[in-house]
Amino acid sequence: RQEVLEMARMMMESAVAVRSYTVSEIKPLLSVQQRRAFIPQTVPAYAASQYIRRLQESHSEYSYKEATLNPTNPANRTTEWEADVVYHFRNQPGEKEIIGERITPTGPQLYMGRPITITNPECLACHDKPSNAPQTLIDTYGSNNGFGWKLNETIGAQIVSVPMSLPLARAQS
């Protein structure tokens, strides 16, 4: 279990690093172009998800999702079990991480979740009201989802899932 947990932590920290890099270095470079066309590469959640998607080319059994109750991009909408993780963080505001196990069609998986809480007022420039959002974002995703977020609200969870089957097999041999 410890080995699987370390793999999950490495994936989570990698996604967090990509998000941070995107906010500090990519988004400022493309702010002018963003006025003419929506550039998803400037969105931290998109950058982290794309990074993990590339990692999945060689490790398809690993996953990362920015699971959101009211996402801008429908691909980020929570499944039932992911919503339980988000509500856990909403009900336990001080908690920073949850670790659990679940059975999937491919075998047991360990998951690690961390809350996505809106702490940066800049997020509300796109996610408060559709009328305040950049038109390029509305043109891409529409005006029905990803709005109404509030400062200090937990709107989702970063969730990493890692298979337990390989380390379990190694431990048994």
Regions found by a protein language model. Give the residues of each.
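Short, cysteine/histidine-rich loop/knuckle motifs that typically chelate Zn2+
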Residues: A125
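Extracytoplasmic c-type cytochrome modules immediately beyond a signal peptide or single-pass transmembrane anchor
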Residues: R1-I118, E122, A133-S173
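Short functional micro-motifs and their immediate structural scaffolds
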Residues: D128-S131
